[in-house]
């Protein structure tokens, strides 16, 4: 216990001075290190603050550039979308024109088919495969060909409209994404250190698995623009093709319609001329029948007129047989009477032969009269079919020039383009 209460050892004055100096030196060294750290920290703070400001400024510039780039592509997409929409609307109008053109061909085809059916009702020798029938068959063939061509063209237009709508969908989807991206980047660009709602986010510095490179991003939008351009150019080419097809087919149909009308006119002219000639021959035959009938009457009278002289001659011969004895002489009178009887019989025979020939000729003339009358009726029937039924019906043909038949012309007329600033009319 006495050891525990012993006083602490005392230091020498030199030790006290040395200890104080050591404290001074340590304090000075510590302070010096601290000052250097403070200076270094301040320099570091200034450097980091400057770097941060520069980095944030650079990010702001990059965001601004990005916004401009997205706005540029958004405008490109907007322009292409507007052009594509206008072109598609034009194609829809052209599709309607083709449908109207196809519909308007039904009546001309029906008229042509009815004309062929009517002309099948011609009778006799007039049921001929003439130029009119050839032109009608050609007209039906032309109409069928035009309808097939218009149908194929309408299928092409329908397919092009589908492709345009596909390109339009891609543009709209791209535009929608770019609008969202613009909104997001615009919000990011407007943020600053004092903005409310800024916060820390865990694992923010990462590469999104579905993200794309800048080159892929550019290629994506550029592909959409190029596809829209390609479909628009294809649409413009198709519109020009439709205009040419409608114009050319209208000319072909109208030309063939004129050929049929001309054939009808020439056919009617020829048939009327044949009818008139037949009627003239019929009149001559009927006149000849009257002459032949008169001739037969004359011949019959001549035969009857020979009965008197024949009876006289026979009576004389019979009476002279009663002469007595030697007076029953074959004298000159007797020979002359015998000769007279023969002459009369011969003349009557000749007259009867002429009468028989006249009867044969009269029968032939009567048959010819009936044949000519039938042929005139055949020609009248043909004229009725061609002029009254066919020609009259063809006056309502929409393919004819002039008149009120403007249905085909309206269907085939070019439609002003919306891209030219004009309204669509059909």
From Swiss-Prot:
Keywords: Cell projection, Cilium, Coiled coil, Cytoplasm, Cytoskeleton, Flagellum, Microtubule, Ubl conjugation. The keyword Manganese does not apply. It is found in: Cytoplasm, Cytoskeleton, Cilium axoneme; Cytoplasm, Cytoskeleton, Flagellum axoneme. GO terms for biological process: cilium assembly; cilium movement involved in cell motility; flagellated sperm motility. Residues 21-84, 268-307, 339-383 form a coiled coil. InterPro entries: Tektin-like (IPR048256), Tektins (IPR000435). One of its GO terms (cellular component) is axonemal A tubule inner sheath. Residues 396-426 are annotated as: Disordered. Its main location: cytoplasm. Ubiquitinated, leading to its degradation. Deubiquitinated by USP16, promoting its stability. PANTHER family: TEKTIN (PTHR19960), TEKTIN-1 (PTHR19960:SF25). Belongs to the tektin family. Microtubule inner protein (MIP) part of the dynein-decorated doublet microtubules (DMTs) in cilia and flagellar axoneme. Forms filamentous polymers in the walls of ciliary and flagellar microtubules. Microtubule inner protein component of sperm flagellar doublet microtubules. This is Tektin-1. It comes from Canis lupus familiaris. The gene is TEKT1.
């Amino acid at each position: 216990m006495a050891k525990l209460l012993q006083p602490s050892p005392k230091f020498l004055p030199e030790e006290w001075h040395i200890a104080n100096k050591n404290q001074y030196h340590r304090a000075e060294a510590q302070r010096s290190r601290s000052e250097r750290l403070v200076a270094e920290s301040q320099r570091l703070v200034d450097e980091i603050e400057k770097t941060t400001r520069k980095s944030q400024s650079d990010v702001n510039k990059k965001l601004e550039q990005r916004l401009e780039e997205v706005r540029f592509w958004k405008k490109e997409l907007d322009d292409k979308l507007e052009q594509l929409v206008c072109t598609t609307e034009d194609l829809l109008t052209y599709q309607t024109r083709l449908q109207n053109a196809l519909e308007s061909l039904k009546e001309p085809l029906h008229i042509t088919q009815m004309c062929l059916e009517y002309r099948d009702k011609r009778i006799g020798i007039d049921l001929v495969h003439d130029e009119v029938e050839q032109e009608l068959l050609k007209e039906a063939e032309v109409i069928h060909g035009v309808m097939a061509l218009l149908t194929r063209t309408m299928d092409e237009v329908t397919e092009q409209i589908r492709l345009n709508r596909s390109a339009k969908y891609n543009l709209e989807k791209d535009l929608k994404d770019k609008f969202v991206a613009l909104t997001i980047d615009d919000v990011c660009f407007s943020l600053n250190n004092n903005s409310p709602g800024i916060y820390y986010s865990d694992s923010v510095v990462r590469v999104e698995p579905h993200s794309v490179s800048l080159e892929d991003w550019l290629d994506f939008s550029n592909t959409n623009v190029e596809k829209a351009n390609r479909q628009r150019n294809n649409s413009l080419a198709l519109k020009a093709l439709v205009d040419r097809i409608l114009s050319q087919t209208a000319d072909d149909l109208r030309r063939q319609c004129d050929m049929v009308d001309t054939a009808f006119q020439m056919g009617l002219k020829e048939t009327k001329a044949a009818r008139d000639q037949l009627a003239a021959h019929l009149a001559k035959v009927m006149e000849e029948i009257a002459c032949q009938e008169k001739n037969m009457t004359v011949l019959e009278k001549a035969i009857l007129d020979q009965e008197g002289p024949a009876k006289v001659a026979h009576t004389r011969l019979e009476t002279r047989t009663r002469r007595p004895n030697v007076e029953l002489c074959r004298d000159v009178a007797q020979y002359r009477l015998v000769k007279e009887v023969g002459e009369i019989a011969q003349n009557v025979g000749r007259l009867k032969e002429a009468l028989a020939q006249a009867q044969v000729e009269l029968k032939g003339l009567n048959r010819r009269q009936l044949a000519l009358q039938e042929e005139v009726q055949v020609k009248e029937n043909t004229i009725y079919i061609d002029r009254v039924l066919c020609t009259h019906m063809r006056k309502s043909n929409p393919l004819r020039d002039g008149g009120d038949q403007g249905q085909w012309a309206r269907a085939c007329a070019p439609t002003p383009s919306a891209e030219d600033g004009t309204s669509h009319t059909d």
